[in-house]
Amino acid sequence: IAPGPIETEMFRAIRPVGSEAEKELLTQIPMNRVGQPQEIAAAIEFLLSEDAGFITGQTLCVDGGGSL
């Protein structure tokens, strides 16, 4: 899993809601928002499931399109 910016206490300490730092970051994310911890957990859950049984050796970017 290669996460993008995720809404955490540490993230918000550096980039408060509405700050210039947050606005600048959001210009680099096509979905125009930061990710939620649950979204990373959901990606991990999928990769651990039988549905992902034939997936090997991959990096899954969970970053709102920031790596495009």
Describe the role of every protein-language-model region.
Residues 55-57:
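Short, small/polar-rich loop/turn modules that mediate ligand/substrate recognition or access, typified
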Residues 30, 61, 67:
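Conserved beta-strand segments that form the floor/walls of ligand-binding pockets within enzyme
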Residues 44:
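Hydrophobic "lid"/C-terminal helical patch
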Residues 2-7, 48, 61-63:
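Conserved SDR Rossmann-fold cofactor-binding beta-strand/turn motif
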Residues 7, 53, 66:
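Functionally critical, cavity-lining and gating residues within the transmembrane helices
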Residues 5-28:
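A glycine/serine/threonine-rich, flexible loop-to-helix segment
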